[in-house]
Curated annotation (Swiss-Prot):
Expressed in flowers and green siliques. The lineage of its organism: Eukaryota, Viridiplantae, Streptophyta, Embryophyta, Tracheophyta. Induction: Repressed by heat and dehydration stress. Residues 136-151 have a biased composition (Low complexity). Component of the NF-Y/HAP transcription factor complex. The NF-Y complex stimulates the transcription of various genes by recognizing and binding to a CCAAT motif in promoters. This is Nuclear transcription factor Y subunit B-7. Residues 1-40, 130-151 are annotated as: Disordered.
Length: 215
């Protein structure tokens, strides 16, 4: 009898085993980590928020930052998804602050609702001032321009009125001389007699009138 020699399995020639320590494996791990990090908040921002509640000499390890980073990101996704469902039911495309507060209340975080409402009101007031500030400045400029224009119009009208008054005065003085002006200033230089000459020409008539009054 001939013994059959067992066939040696040398593996499939088309399949290559990957070594965990190879450069390609490290590249794949880095790509996966980058994709995972894209879903999270920036770890620098998370670290700054965490340091605000620590003493000045307090320190935070890297794994603590990464843990909080993942938890916060998942929480944000959770709340945003609930608010998004509400907007879809109401056929709206934009999630607003009221939707976020509604989602937090629905998910059972009632203790956070009151401070979030206070923050939302302050935020809206601040943003409203930023938006309205250019409009208010533009309105002030328009009001100043209107006031300046009205002032110029008033000065022009006042000057025009003064010119009209001067014209009327000169016209009256030229065509209607004042009776209180001296004889030398009367505008009739071509007249050949004066009040004195009239008295000289009619002295007798004047005396007769006086005698008739006495008698």
């Amino acid at each position: 009898m001939t013994e059959e020699s067992p066939e040696e399995d040398h593996g499939s020639p088309g399949v290559a085993e990957t070594n965990p320590g190879s450069p390609s494996s490290k590249t794949n791990n880095n790509n996966n980590n980058n994709k995972e990090q894209d879903r999270f908040l920036p770890i620098a921002n998370v670290g700054r928020i965490m340091k605000k509640v620590l003493p000045g000499n307090g320190k935070i390890s890297k794994d603590a930052k990464e843990t909080v980073q993942e938890c916060v990101s998942e929480f944000i996704s959770f709340v945003t998804g609930e608010a998004s469902d509400k907007c879809q039911r109401e056929k709206r495309k934009t999630i607003n602050g009221d939707d976020i507060i509604w989602a937090i209340t629905t998910l059972g975080f009632e203790d956070y609702v009151a401070p979030l409402k206070v923050y939302l009101c302050k935020y809206r007031d601040t943003e409203g001032e930023k938006v309205n500030s250019p409009k208010q400045q533009q309105q002030r400029q328009q009001q100043q321009q209107i006031q300046q224009q009205n002032h110029h119009n008033y000065q022009f009208q006042e000057q025009d009125q003064n010119n009209n008054n001067m014209s009327c005065t000169s016209y009256i003085s030229h065509h209607h001389p004042s009776p209180f002006l001296p004889v030398d200033h009367q505008p009739f230089p071509n007249i050949a007699f004066s009040p004195k000459s009239l008295q000289k020409q009619f002295p007798q008539q004047h005396d007769n009138n006086i005698d008739s009054i006495h008698w």
